[in-house]
Amino acid sequence: MNDLVDGSTARTSPRRRGATELTSVQEDRSQVVIAGRIPLSTASDQILEARQLTKIYRKGRNEVQVLSGCDFQARRGKVTAILGQSGSGKSTLLHLLGTLDTPDEGEITFEGQRIDNLPRRRRDEFRNRQLGMIFQFYHLLPEITTLQNVMMPMMIQQGLFSYLRARAAYRARAEQLLERVGLEHRLTHRPRELSGGEMQRAAIARALVGSPQLLLADEPTGNLDRETGQTILKLLLEINREQGLTIVMVTHDESIAADCDRVIRLEDGRIVA
């Protein structure tokens, strides 16, 4: 498994490069969403938009309405915080925006094309190619190295045979990203050998390896101490500035939200500001 993912178990030292010189995974993003991709659009400032989202969870005869008529826009190249207390519905909203779940009412568009009503397979393709996602918990595979964890999304996105043909390029991309997040000395370490902050930095590199247009972050500092959390936040903001990457971040922390370009407040399933 290890050799399949990265082609080598030897330690390597990535070439030093500036953050803006990171090798991009070469993709033709001009195809329509039917194939899992969405064409880039310069006509609108909004890369992602949701209208009148409602989500109800049902268990037997009981219903809990988690979101009620929520409108949301993510501005291209900006960092938007979704701020709210536990139970306000902010993580549910992020999961809907990331096509991990579907709304009971309302619609979501990405680059002007609707995505919430796509068949599951096409939603998965869209998410794999267009989005990067990080969570409070890191979800690194414990059996493989940090480098292999970062490379893994490319195997899933490209399919085994296409991945094997371009594995060297994907490895170089993963090494450069790990260098960018300060983990060039941890390429061959497994998750159990990393600190919490290092695991989250590895998760950020993994989320970026496919060159997503949009990064969704669900409480990315929630499992870290304040100092480490501030380091992770600073890293995300630097990546936003360097790459122009659009970021939507869920948080309950006012100080984190204050550093974002825009703040959306959510209370009891409704956007209030």
Predicted regions and their residues:
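ABC-family P-loop ATPase nucleotide-binding domain
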Residues: 1-56, 273
